[in-house]
Amino acid sequence: GSSAIAKVTRHDVVIAPHAVHHIFPIDTLMGDLSVQGEAEKLIVDRPDVIFHLAAIVSGEAEANFEKGYQINLDGTRYLFEAIRKAGGGYKPKVIFTSSIAVFGAPFPDAIPDDYFTTPLTSYGTQKAICELLLADYSRRGFMDGVGLRFPTVCVRPGKPNLAASGFFSNIIREPLAG
């Protein structure tokens, strides 16, 4: 069935501005999922749907091995564990943003669903591990998870960052800046 959105909760390490007028309440929480205990704060209200977009970008994950695993893997694992431990039949829909970085080159023009993962970077490895965790937690009935492999997730404002996919942001951002 379908139902109206009752509330949206945003959670990030940095609070981004959002429109003042919207048709449903938007709560904003600040915190770091890679810190144990932080994910439980999100699960208290038992959201029906969780969009998990948290990660550091590919170039930064490659440059700082420990930080990449802490944020990209541990943060995801802590979130999944908070969901599992909530118990009481709680089983949210979890949409996990993965990456085409799980595939090593060369790969075909059209990548089938069953194409094997052979990441060439730490970032790709972290995303591949998280995909396996998502599949296992879903298989065990702790969540209804789906992973989406994108070439990029959003256009980032400001100066370019270390993301390998940063050129996508540049394509949009540069013309807008004049």
Predicted feature descriptions by range:
Residues 1-49:
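N-terminal Rossmann/SDR dinucleotide-binding element
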Residues 11, 50-56, 94-100, 148-150:
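SDR active-site strand-loop-helix element
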Residues 21-22, 60-67, 105-109, 159:
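Conserved catalytic-core motifs of eukaryotic protein kinase domains, centered on the activation segment
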Residues 28, 68, 94, 145-148:
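Hydrophobic/aromatic anchor residues within beta-strands of the central parallel beta-sheet
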Residues 33-71:
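NAD(P)H-binding glycine-rich loop region in Rossmannoid oxidoreductase-like domains
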Residues 77-121:
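Conserved Rossmann-fold NAD(P)-dependent oxidoreductase catalytic core, especially the SDR/UDP-sugar
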Residues 126:
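Active-site helix of classical SDR
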Residues 135-178:
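NAD(P)-dependent short-chain dehydrogenase/reductase
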